[in-house]
């Protein structure tokens, strides 16, 4: 039971890390969902 819990926690951690990498990766503004722009390879909200 303990092994299963550790495995599930590890799987969740890996999924979160993969999700963060996918969100941050952009080369141009069109790679980000509106209203966000690509700033230094990261999708950032555009204000103003």
Swiss-Prot record:
Give the main location: secreted
According to the UniProt entry, which residues carry Tyrosine amide?
A: 47
Q: Which UniProt keywords apply?
A: Amidation, Disulfide bond, Secreted, Signal
Q: Does the keyword Cell inner membrane apply?
A: no
Keyword Disulfide bond in annotation = yes
GO cellular component assignments: extracellular region
Propeptide section residues: 22-24
- Where's it found, cell-wise? Secreted
From the UniProt annotation, give the residues forming the signal peptide: 1-21
Query: What does the entry state regarding organ or tissue expression?
Result: Expressed in salivary glands. Highly expressed in the head, body and tail with a 2-3-fold higher expression in the head.
Give the disulfide map: 26-38, 32-43
Family listed: Belongs to the annelide toxin family.
Functionally, this protein is described as follows: Leech salivary gland peptide with unknown function.
One further remark on this entry is: Does not show effect on voltage-gated calcium channels, potassium channels, and tetrodotoxin-sensitive sodium channels. Does not show activity on Nav1.7/SCN9A, and shows very weak activity on cation channel TRPA1.
Q: What is this protein called?
A: Peptide HSTX-III
Native organism is Haemadipsa sylvestris
